[in-house]
Regions:
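Catalytic core of pol beta-like nucleotidyltransferases
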Residues: 1-32, 40-46, 56-115
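Short beta-strand->loop micro-motif that forms the acidic, two-metal-ion catalytic signature
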Residues: 51-55
Length: 115
């Protein structure tokens, strides 16, 4: 996990993670938010980013545009983030396929929000 005492402005910290989760819930309509990757495994370092899977309702027309919209809303939170947006039906199709990040998120991720 990132060392909070270093004070690096881009560092992944629990306070920034909580702020990012709150902001995503505020600006998007997520069905579920899953954190995954090095932060969840407790292996984050100064070169790590925060991996966030945003599962949306199926009526989101363009997941890529939704990801950009979320990223813009998170501009004030200074840490590197990888935001993956996937509609619910696509999530159900892909979550068990080996080699995809969806499977890692499902198997090793931490659900931080579910509506």
């Amino acid at each position: 996990m990132a060392n909070a005492s270093t004070g690096k402005p881009w560092e992944v910290t629990s306070d920034k993670v909580e702020a990012a989760v709150r902001k995503i819930i505020e600006v998007s309509r997520p069905l579920k938010l899953i954190l995954f990757g090095s932060y969840v495994r407790g292996e984050a370092n100064l070169n790590s980013d925060l991996d966030i899977l945003v599962i949306t309702p199926d009526d989101i027309e363009n997941p890529r545009k939704e990801s950009v919209r979320i990223r813009r809303a998170l501009r004030g939170i200074s840490m590197p983030m990888d935001i993956v947006v996937v509609p619910r039906t696509k999530w159900e199709e892909l979550k068990n396929l080996p080699g995809l990040i969806y499977r890692e998120a499902m198997m090793k991720g931490r659900v931080v929000y579910e509506s």
